[in-house]
Curated annotation (Swiss-Prot):
InterPro entries named in the record: DUF520, UPF0234-like_C, UPF0234_N, YajQ-like_sf
Domain of life: Bacteria
MF terms (GO), sorted A to Z: nucleotide binding
Family: Belongs to the YajQ family.
GO cellular component: cytosol
Function: Nucleotide-binding protein.
Nucleotide-binding keyword on record: yes
Protein name per Swiss-Prot or TrEMBL: Nucleotide-binding protein BHWA1_00627
One Pfam family this sequence matches: DUF520
Length: 165
């Protein structure tokens, strides 16, 4: 007999898509008339999984972040995949914002998701496996109900479903 149907809940981001979004945003910022002559930088560090934005003022920083988020939306990325790590003063009056790219589900959120699944009182098992959650059950309908519930809730990171078996 075959194993019970299952799927994994993960939070993954394609770094190549983020790299493309950053490059397109940098090109748009370089071509915008209202940003001419200003020291604005967006840097992607793939090793540390961070995006650093440098802007001369807080207002400009917000505009640059909005441009970056527009590029994320066009490419189908959720803006929840960026978490502000720290905002600091840079040289002169400039402001530097370091954003962390969320990758994987942390333990506290994983426990909350498993609790939410168990509160549904369906015959499914949810187990935390490193930075993902495996959900298995006898009926595919129960698994689909779990997916619907998770999509309906607003978690602080984007979640995807993989490894349907």
């Amino acid at each position: 007999m075959a194993k019970d149907p299952s799927f994994d809940i993960v939070s993954e981001v394609d770094m190549q898509v983020i790299d493309d979004c950053v490059n397109v945003a940098v090109k748009e910022i370089d071509n915008r008339f209202d940003f001419k002559g200003q020291n604005i930088q967006i840097e992607l560090n793939k090793g540390e999984k961070t995006i650093t934005i440098l802007a001369p003022a807080d207002f400009v920083l917000n505009q640059v972040r909005d441009i970056l988020f527009q590029k994320f939306i066009k490419r189908g990325l959720n803006q929840k995949c960026l978490r502000e790590k720290k905002k600091e003063k840079a040289a002169g009056d400039a402001i530097r914002e370091i954003n962390e790219i969320v990758h994987g589900i942390d333990k506290d959120l994983a426990k909350q998701i498993v609790k939410d699944i168990k509160d549904m009182k369906l015959k499914v098992q949810a187990s935390i496996q490193d930075e993902q959650i495996r959900v298995s059950g006898a009926k595919k309908d129960d698994l689909q109900a779990v997916i619907t519930m998770i999509k309906g809730k607003d978690y602080p990171i984007p979640l995807q479903f993989t490894n349907y078996r």
